[in-house]
Amino acid sequence: MERHEQILKEIAFLELRLQSLKLELEFVRSSGSEQKGKIEPFRPNSECSATPMQTAIGKESSNPLMAISLPKAEKKHSKASEVPSPHKTVKEFSEIPKDFLRPNQGIQIPKKNEDHSSSSSKEEKGIQNPKKDFYVVYNGPYAGIYDHWGTAKKATNKIPGVSYKKFKDMLSARTSADIYTNAQFGEKLKYIPGATTSPKSFAEALTTRPSNMKSLGKPKFIKIEEDDDVGFNPEFDLKSFLYIYKYGRNLEEEHFLTDRAFTIDKKEISYLNFVNNSDPEGILESFKAGLVRFIYPSTNLQELRLLPKVLKSSVQRFRKKCIKDSEKEIFLKIKSTIPCWEDYYNGLDDSVSYRPNYLVQIGISKGVNYQPSQKMEAVVLKEQWQGIAEEKAIEFFQAIEDILSNEKIFIIYCDDRILIYSSSPKERTKEDLMAILNFQSEVSSCKLLGFHSDKICSYLNKKASVGKPYSCPQKGKAVITSGPSFSVEDTLSDTE
């Protein structure tokens, strides 16, 4: 019971304390200030300035320059005492608020609460500019999201296999980066603003060379020779071909996000199709194997950077002269033969007997014609390869005939290995027709496969004109006989 009474007394005391605090709060609010302090004591002997001369018509009491409160207080106090005391307090001058001359009577304006979000989110919120481009570097040692092309270019320059892409806003860039990192089970890519790449200290700023400074000369550096153009006769052995062949047969739908590739599957061969941000080295190896069907490059064409120079320059020429909008995407449709190897049936020599020929169409893309990849059986018997190569050669001849029948066509480039063309609203010229006919005459021969083929001879004889029958240059030579059968799986394991 004693503890109970003690608690009741404490509650009553706290209630009284609360009431007293409320009264004190009301008093502070009525006085117009929450601050406590002393003011200067009033000096009655100080001279009061006269009321300024009134220039407007009316009574003197209406003059806005007259001091009303202060003189009344001064007059009242002067009667009470003539000698000022330094110990007077605020209570003796209740007519004058202590914050009389302060704005809002000394009431402080409340400050807005600051946003305590992370610094990275603040940086991303502060860069929402619709006119600014963002660059996502997906992989490599400097992966991240950049808002300055100069910095992004340094992060991708001379780094093999790096993938990057430009976006119009931060949301698209962040979404694409997150999709990639989630598929790779990696860490979230960081946003790297251009400001972080500038000098961060005074010493660094002093040592940084201004861009507008006049140069008095250039130091001599040792020139590092770059790799020569791969051209259309690259080093390509049987092991590399079988690896690409098996890769295409084993590609599945779930690999699209990581490899940026899908396949068009046939009975014996799967043709690879590459979209933006795909690996340039993979595109090059598949191109040399003759197993590429479509390429959908980015606007910066970084996926094509390892392909032969004549192909890259032709694509750049098409973009410059045939497309007004530089942001439009394009496609490359490739039709080719497959490579053949010397003495294929008697030992499988790695040296290539004859490399693929190519027909490349360049056009404006209306979207990726995507179809999911399916895992296919990667077993081809030894005697089947000759038949497959002959069938692909005949399909190649048929594709040339289709180009000849199309009158609205423009030839971009042509030599004895490749024909690059595009559709045109205008009819083809005589120069275009001559280029197609010359290319047809170069490839329409049994030497296309490096050995004699009765099937190709029969096809060319049927398609030859009446006045110009086809004459096989290798007719009468011995045809290579078939050897024992083998599978691609066995060959791949042997070469490894």
Swiss-Prot record:
Residues 111-128 have a biased composition (Basic and acidic residues). GO terms for cellular component: host cell cytoplasm. Residues 102-128 are annotated as: Disordered. Keywords: Host cytoplasm, Translation regulation. It is found in: Host cytoplasm. It comes from the Viruses. InterPro entries: Ribosomal_bL9/RNase_H1_N, RNase_H1_N, RNase_H1_N_sf. SUPFAM superfamilies: L9 N-domain-like (SSF55658). Belongs to the caulimoviridae viroplasmin family. Enhances the translation of downstream ORFs on polycistronic mRNAs derived from carnation etched ring virus. The inclusion bodies are the site of viral DNA synthesis, virion assembly and accumulation in the infected cell. This is Transactivator/viroplasmin protein. It comes from Carnation etched ring virus (CERV). The lineage of its organism: Viruses, Riboviria, Pararnavirae, Artverviricota, Revtraviricetes.
